[in-house]
Amino acid sequence: MILHNTDFGHILVGSGTQGFFGEGYPFHKILKPFGLNFEGYTFVAKTTTLRPRKGNLPLKTDGITPEELFPDCIKVYFRKGVVLNAVGLSGPGAKFLFEDGRWQKIKKPFFISFMAVGESFEIRYLEAINFAILFKKYLPSFSAPVGLQINFSCPNVKVGLKIPDPKIQAEEMRAILGIISSYAPIPLMPKINVLTPVEVAKEIASDPNCDALCVSNTIPWGALPHKINWTKTGVSPLAHLGGGGLSGKPLLLIVAEWVLNARKAGIEKPINAGGGILSPDDVDVLKGAAADSVSVSSAAILRGWRVKKIIRRANEIFEGE
């Protein structure tokens, strides 16, 4: 996937899969002897907000490391191939992360991920402005080309769910793309989920400041009941934290269908597609749907021993294009 004349590769890790700087998580060390290996991917940082955010994931005093090996806000169902999380964008805020300096030392093209989370559009717009000003300040010190994934769809923040009018939703996304682009002329890739109507995605993709689309973020608990078999009770095990967002096996065919419909609707911008990739063959499903690249995330938890093969398969089948 080439954006602004920079090759960002054929496979990205989902934002947060390896933390804010690629430091990973304690369970990665446990799975490494069993074959967990991220070599050959493009790094995407965990989504940050402008200001420090407590979220639902307790962090150590360094501001980035989870306190618990098995956090209460993440539920893993290995046999079903499903992860449910209500992390809620816990983090130290953008200023802390830029000042840390580790992003600036990365040597390969990568993505930072950002989300504005204010209660109103006016507040979210101001957050985007201030984030863009920060980015502009530190951008000259980066060693490698960097893109920005703008998260518009985290279900644990529920910002997008508060904008029921698709037209207003598209207008807000375009406004934020425009203001960030005016400060930081870098590749911009909005991250949406399959609940985003294709017509909204088409309007966003038509914006000159949109360089690619990323789909799909996790799905809010209980959404798409005609496609996802939720529990009989309909009660989320993370109901006390707002319900959480689902990732894993059920999303693969839903994402593939969304990408196919996006292409039929005339969306020509590159699409980075992910959701439910748990084996190398799953990459072929999204490639067949006309995705330009893929992203892998929940496989690192659910099928860690397959991650290396998934990355290899993605690089093989997209390389020939």
Features from the language model and the residues they span:
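Surface-exposed amphipathic alpha-helices with a cationic face
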Residues: 4-5, 101-105, 136, 174-184, ...
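Catalytic cores of alpha/beta
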Residues: 22-30, 126-132, 196-208, 264-265, ...
